[in-house]
């Protein structure tokens, strides 16, 4: 059994990750919050035996084998490196870090320490996206030529705060949502992005210059072009993910979500058909793969390197939106 420590008393851990760890044979034995009061309450609420107030205490605990980092973005590097130095496996929330240099440092450190580093990109675990990837690989739409991602949602009040108010913490829709688009596109297309263009704005929710909406496009190395629309501000929009090829189209609806829902339609000269989907919990799929990787079998659903690619794409979108010019996507890996 893999024993986990949590860095951060986060909503995502409470709503999704703690349950996924337990459902896949792991145990959550400790959690860390800089607030002793909050940490104790969180631990009690979630059935966690220990609560500590420092990263050093958590990663130094011999009862902890792996660490889940879900603090604000600017803290990811130092906390992940501390865990790696202590010989712990790490599943880190996206984005891995605030800069590519820091993200690469995390990947190299994990490799040299011989521990597993994963990025918590949940969407590549969705049955819809896996079915689309398989259909493309099987040639069911011919050669992919374009993709479209609709990921404009409404950020609920309990998730607002720093995402809308703190640029220094990595707030804003690009590093929160666009990085997920980037990873899902890479996964489904089995292709790497090369260049991005974008326009961003604040429609009233973002403060301190934080963008709450962005539209843009990405050109992939194969020549596929993809467009995306991401936002925190749209209460009634539907999410979607489409890939269009020379011989057909894949149309995913309600698939850019944490829940195991949505549909995928294959449309071609023969008509329309629904792809069969297994509605498995996305986070349980991710944690099962992570536990297997710890045991020496395979790798996480999204590796540290995958996290570098999504961050590189997100930062290119930030640059393109700021300059009005196309920005190259380079990881330095």
UniProtKB/Swiss-Prot annotation:
**Effect upon mutating residue 10 to G:** Almost no effect
Give the UniProt keywords, A-Z: NADP, Oxidoreductase
Q: Which GO terms describe its molecular function?
A: 1,5-anhydro-D-fructose reductase (1,5-anhydro-D-mannitol-forming) activity; nucleotide binding
Q: Specify the enzyme's EC class, one word.
A: oxidoreductase
**By its UniProt entry, which Pfam families does this protein fall under?**
GFO_IDH_MocA, GFO_IDH_MocA_C3
Which Enzyme Commission numbers does its entry carry?
A: 1.1.1.292
Give the catalysed reaction(s), semicolon-separated. 1,5-anhydro-D-mannitol + NADP(+) = 1,5-anhydro-D-fructose + NADPH + H(+)
Give the record's pH note. Optimum pH is 6.5 at 30 degrees Celsius.
Residues reported to bind NADP(+): 9-12, 33-34, 38, 71-76, 93-94, 120, 162-163, 283
Q: Which InterPro entries would you find in this protein's record?
A: Gfo/Idh/MocA-like_OxRdtase_N, Gfo/Idh/MocA_domain, GFO_IDH_MocA-like_dom, NAD(P)-bd_dom_sf
What does the UniProt record report as the effect of altering residue 180 to A in this chain? Less than 2% remaining activity
According to its UniProt entry, the function of this protein is described as: Catalyzes the NADPH-specific reduction of 1,5-anhydro-D-fructose to 1,5-anhydro-D-mannitol. Also shows some activity against structurally related compounds such as 3-keto-1,5-anhydro-D-fructose, D-glucosone and D-xylosone. The enzyme cannot use NADH as cosubstrate.
Q: How does it assemble?
A: Monomer.
Q: Which family does it belong to?
A: Belongs to the Gfo/Idh/MocA family.
Indicate what this protein is called per its UniProt record. Answer: 1,5-anhydro-D-fructose reductase
Q: What is the lineage of its organism?
A: Bacteria, Pseudomonadati, Pseudomonadota, Alphaproteobacteria, Hyphomicrobiales
- Gene symbol here is afr
């Amino acid at each position: 059994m893999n024993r986990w420590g949590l860095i951060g008393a986060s909503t995502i851990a409470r709503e999704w990750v703690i349950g996924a760890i337990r459902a896949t044979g792991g145990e959550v034995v400790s959690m860390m919050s800089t607030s002793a009061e909050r940490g104790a309450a969180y631990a009690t609420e979630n059935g966690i035996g220990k609560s500590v107030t420092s990263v050093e205490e958590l990663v130094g605990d011999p009862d902890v084998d792996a660490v889940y980092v879900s603090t604000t973005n600017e803290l990811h590097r130092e906390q992940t490196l501390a865990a790696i130095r202590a010989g712990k496996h790490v599943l880190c929330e996206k984005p891995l870090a605030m800069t590519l240099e820091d993200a690469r440092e995390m990947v190299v450190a994990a490799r040299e320490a011989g521990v597993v580093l994963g990025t918590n990109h949940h969407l590549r675990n969705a049955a819809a996206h896996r079915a689309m990837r398989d259909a493309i690989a099987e040639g069911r739409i011919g050669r992919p030529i374009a993709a479209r991602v609709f990921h404009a949602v409404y950020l609920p009040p309990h998730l607002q705060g720093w995402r809308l108010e703190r640029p220094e913490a990595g707030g804003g829709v690009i590093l929160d949502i666009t990085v997920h688009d980037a990873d899902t596109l890479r996964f489904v297309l089995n292709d790497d992005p090369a260049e991005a263009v974008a326009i961003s704005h604040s429609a009233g929710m973002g403060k301190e210059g934080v963008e709450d909406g962005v539209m843009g496009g990405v050109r992939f190395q194969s020549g596929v072009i993809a467009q995306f629309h991401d936002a925190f501000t749209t209460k009634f929009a539907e999410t979607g993910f489409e890939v269009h090829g020379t011989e057909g189209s894949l149309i995913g609806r309600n698939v850019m979500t944490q829940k195991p829902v949505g549909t995928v339609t294959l449309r071609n000269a023969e008509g329309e058909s629904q792809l069969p989907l297994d509605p498995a919990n996305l986070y349980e799929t991710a944690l099962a793969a992570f536990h297997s990787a710890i045991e020496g079998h395979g790798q996480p659903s999204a590796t540290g390197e995958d996290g570098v690619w999504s961050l590189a794409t997100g930062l290119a979108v930030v640059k393109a939106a700021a300059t009005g010019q196309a920005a190259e996507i380079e990881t330095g890996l």
